């Protein structure tokens, strides 16, 4: 199942990352470090190096340690400070509230109360988060906050 940022129809994550709903409106998603390789496995494209007399040892294989969620979805790290993140969040929430007003207006009071609680914690610990946008890099789209939690 894909989870989308609805305003810009961007896939943010899938259920393979074990999402869970927090405070009725937010998702926390598990992610891990993994190694990504640039080496192309010729067998996946129909090549048979040993049968064709080719030696694939000359192929340059660069690998890097990546966060699986970031790598799989093309997220781009964005250097927000707290002030600029607050401004972005205010703009994003305004658009979300307008959408809810049209679709499910009875959820607005709950959204506002949960957002106020959730953002207090985020703002208090903002220096522990890394910010990402989706591959569209649209400045009005959702910002993904990543915080590493030990023991989960």
From Swiss-Prot:
Protein localization: Cytoplasm
Domain TCTP: 1-152
Keywords from the UniProt entry: Calcium, Cytoplasm
The keyword Cytoplasm is assigned to this record: yes
InterPro entries xref list: Mss4-like_sf, Mss4/transl-control_tumour, TCTP, Translation_control_tumour_CS, Translational_control_tumour_p
A molecular function GO annotation: calcium ion binding
Keyword Calcium: yes
GO CC annotation, single: cytoplasm
Domain of life: Eukaryota
Principal localisation: cytoplasm
Function recorded in the entry: Involved in calcium binding and microtubule stabilization.
Family note: Belongs to the TCTP family.
Protein name: Translationally-controlled tumor protein homolog
Annotated source species: Schistosoma haematobium
């Amino acid at each position: 199942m894909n989870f989308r940022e609805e305003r810009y129809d961007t896939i943010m994550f899938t259920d393979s990352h074990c999402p869970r709903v927090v405070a009725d409106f937010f998702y926390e998603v598990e992610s891990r470090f993994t190694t990504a390789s640039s080496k192309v496995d010729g067998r996946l494209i129909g090549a048979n190096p040993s049968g064709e007399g080719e030696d694939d040892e000359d192929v340059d294989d660069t690998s890097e340690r990546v966060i699986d969620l970031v790598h799989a979805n093309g997220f781009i790290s964005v250097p927000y400070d707290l002030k600029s993140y607050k401004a972005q969040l205010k703009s994003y929430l305004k658009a979300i509230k307008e959408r809810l007003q049209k679709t499910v207006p009875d959820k607005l009071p709950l959204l506002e109360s949960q957002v106020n609680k959730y953002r207090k914690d985020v703002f208090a610990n903002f220096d522990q988060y890394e910010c990402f946008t989706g591959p569209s890099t649209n400045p009005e789209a959702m910002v993904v906050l990543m915080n590493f939690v030990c023991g989960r």
